[in-house]
């Protein structure tokens, strides 16, 4: 396996031309490139929205964009969105510092990637309308080309890391008399692993639980009399 570090904006083009088998880039960047690709796996990081924004205090909606100047680093995404709404506008491509273009008189509104909104607020801007697109880092492949066996191995390994990030491994000791109730709280994927302890009438239990539910699960186990409750991160998991 060879890895190439390229400009995120160019990755979809390399994949579409068959130069690369798989690529990791932002969904927004891939779509703006107008390259032909298939999204294979969302990776759950680098999340953002692509929004229109205007000076704070001004009331805007997308119907008012007809004939206006719109500054953006993603002209193809903007043109496609405007076309969907039957709007013609002057789309001005800028490679950076899009937020300041209104203050400098270059544009009436902007269209830009918004993560936390801090940069927009610092420039006195506020988003309006529905998001043009919701983006995150994704794995892409060339359209119409089947994933090879070697590529599937790479994808499975990535998916294993994503699975591991959403689960914790819970270990605890509990009285045999409370095992059924505890197992109902920690069912795992196909059932918890139960092992006898030297302490008579007690067992050790291990199960995977969704990370988002970990505190509630541990609270419930405590109520059931469980002891030595431990939660461990997973590095990789195959389901």
Feature-to-residue mapping (PLM):
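Small-molecule-sensing regulatory modules
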Residues: 1, 5, 25-38, 44-45, ...
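Short, structured active-site "lid" loops
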Residues: 1-19
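Signature of uroporphyrinogen-III synthase
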Residues: 13, 49-53
């Amino acid at each position: 396996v060879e890895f190439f570090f390229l400009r995120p904006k160019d990755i979809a083009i390399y994949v579409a031309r068959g130069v690369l088998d798989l690529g990791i880039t932002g969904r927004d960047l891939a779509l703006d490139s107008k390259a032909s690709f298939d999204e294979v796996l969302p990776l759950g990081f680098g999340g953002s929205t692509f929004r229109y924004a205007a000076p704070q205090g001004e009331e805007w909606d997308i119907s008012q964009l007809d004939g206006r100047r719109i500054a953006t680093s993603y002209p193809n995404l903007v043109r496609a969105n405007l076309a969907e709404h039957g709007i013609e506008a002057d789309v001005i491509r800028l490679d950076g510092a899009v937020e300041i273009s209104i203050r400098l008189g270059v544009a009436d509104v902007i269209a830009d990637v918004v993560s936390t909104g801090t940069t927009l607020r610092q420039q006195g801007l506020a988003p309006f309308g529905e998001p043009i697109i919701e983006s995150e880092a994704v794995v892409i492949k060339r359209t119409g080309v089947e994933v090879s066996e070697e590529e599937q191995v790479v994808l499975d390994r990535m998916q294993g890391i994503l699975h591991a990030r959403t689960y914790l491994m819970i270990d605890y000791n509990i009285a045999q008399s409370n095992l059924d109730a505890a197992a109902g709280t920690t069912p795992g994927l196909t059932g918890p692993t139960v092992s006898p302890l030297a302490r008579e009438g007690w067992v050790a239990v291990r199960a995977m639980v969704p990370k988002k539910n970990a505190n509630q699960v541990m609270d419930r186990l405590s109520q059931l009399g469980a002891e030595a409750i431990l939660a461990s991160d997973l590095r990789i998991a195959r389901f």
